[in-house]
Each structure stands twice: as C-alpha cells, then as structure tokens.
Amino acid sequence: RCPXHLQEYFYTSSKCSMAAVVFITRKNRQVCANPEKKWVREYINSLELS
C-alpha cells in the first residue's frame, strides 16, 4: 500500500551516475529512493494501479 502523500514517480535519466526513483509528494517535494529496494517497487506498483 502506497502512502497517500505520494502522487507520482519517475526514474532518473541514464545520464545520472546512480539509478534512482524519484517520488513526488502532494507538497511537490522530491524523494529519491533506491529502485532495488522492495518497498520502492511496492510503492511503484501501488501508484501504477491507482
């Protein structure tokens, strides 16, 4: 289940030295996360289904 404060996400570009997922909150804050972590994949799946 995804926290309600997350609106969307995107992956960093291939130009970045480190792969990451960036979540956007309702207050337009950006939160970087490791795409290999289980909780990150779960949040992505939850956002895709909503």
Curated annotation (Swiss-Prot):
PANTHER family for this protein: C-C MOTIF CHEMOKINE 5 (PTHR12015:SF170), SMALL INDUCIBLE CYTOKINE A (PTHR12015)
Keyword Secreted in annotation: yes
TM spans (from-to): none
Designated name of the protein: C-C motif chemokine 5
A Gene Ontology molecular function term of the record: chemokine activity
Keywords: Chemotaxis, Cytokine, Inflammatory response, Secreted
Main location, first listed in the record: secreted
Gene3D superfamilies per the UniProt record, alphabetical: 2.40.50.40
Biological role stated in the UniProt entry: Chemoattractant for blood monocytes, memory T-helper cells and eosinophils. Causes the release of histamine from basophils and activates eosinophils. May activate several chemokine receptors including CCR1, CCR3, CCR4 and CCR5. May also be an agonist of the G protein-coupled receptor GPR75. Together with GPR75, may play a role in neuron survival through activation of a downstream signaling pathway involving the PI3, Akt and MAP kinases. By activating GPR75 may also play a role in insulin secretion by islet cells.
InterPro entries xrefs: Chemokine_b/g/d (IPR039809), Chemokine_IL8-like_dom (IPR001811), Interleukin_8-like_sf (IPR036048)
GO cellular component, one term: extracellular space
Compartments, record wording: Secreted
GO biological process, one term: chemokine-mediated signaling pathway
CDD domains: Chemokine_CC
Similarity comment: family membership: Belongs to the intercrine beta (chemokine CC) family.
Keyword Cell wall biogenesis/degradation found: no
Superkingdom of origin organism: Eukaryota
